[in-house]
């Protein structure tokens, strides 16, 4: 995932949190400086590849939540995910023994939902910062280096295994391409459409 995508999502999350800092109430008070520290240290999100490992390994307590509208969820969703559209998040119930992972198409709504849940006191909540774009780029169709070093072999083998597990196909980079490309070539909607055509 690119640094630009992380910074954009982080800025959005803090922008959503700012009104809580100005006029806190017992129901919505939130420690914005603490949130800012979490965002700065990347404690607010989890990489898509890590979430893929947790799904594959059936990590206890994992609760994967898709905050997109139901019609989008019904077209494509991550394995084991439940649909809680963002407007229904305030009424949802969560327990302390759950690890809640939020995602949306590109990450913006998941970041907003993360702020809402932090304001509500949910402890173990994170989001996939790049949303489905990261899932398609990093899990289903990871870009593999053309000439991997010996030290990369184990990581690449795992990426290939995860891609196959979830029905994807890795992409092979041309020489020099892996270092130059950190953004998808097309929009998220196109990636999703292509994956649907491939049956993912």
Segments the model singles out, each with a brief description of its role:
Residues 1-49, 57-62, 70-99, 105-200:
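Rhodanese-like catalytic fold shared by cysteine-dependent sulfurtransferases
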């Amino acid at each position: 995932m690119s640094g630009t995508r992380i910074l954009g999502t982080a800025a959005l999350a803090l922008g959503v949190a700012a009104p809580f800092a100005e006029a806190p109430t017992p129901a919505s008070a939130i420690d914005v400086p603490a949130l800012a520290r979490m965002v700065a240290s990347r404690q607010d999100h989890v990489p898509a590849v890590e979430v893929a490992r947790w799904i594959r390994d059936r990590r206890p307590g994992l609760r994967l939540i898709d905050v997109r509208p139901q019609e989008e969820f019904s077209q494509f969703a991550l394995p084991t995910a439940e649909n809680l559209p963002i407007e229904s998040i305030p009424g949802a119930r969560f327990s302390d023994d759950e690890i809640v992972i939020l995602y949306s198409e590109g990450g913006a709504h998941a970041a907003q939902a993360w702020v809402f849940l932090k304001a509500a006191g949910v402890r173990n909540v994170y989001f996939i910062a790049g949303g489905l774009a990261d899932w398609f780029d990093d899990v289903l169709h990871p870009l593999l280096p053309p000439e991997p070093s010996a030290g990369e072999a184990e990581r690449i083998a795992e990426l290939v295994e995860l891609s196959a597990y979830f029905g994807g196909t890795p992409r092979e980079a041309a020489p020099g391409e892996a270092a130059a490309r950190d953004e998808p070539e097309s929009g998220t909607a196109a990636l999703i459409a292509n994956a649907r055509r491939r049956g993912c």
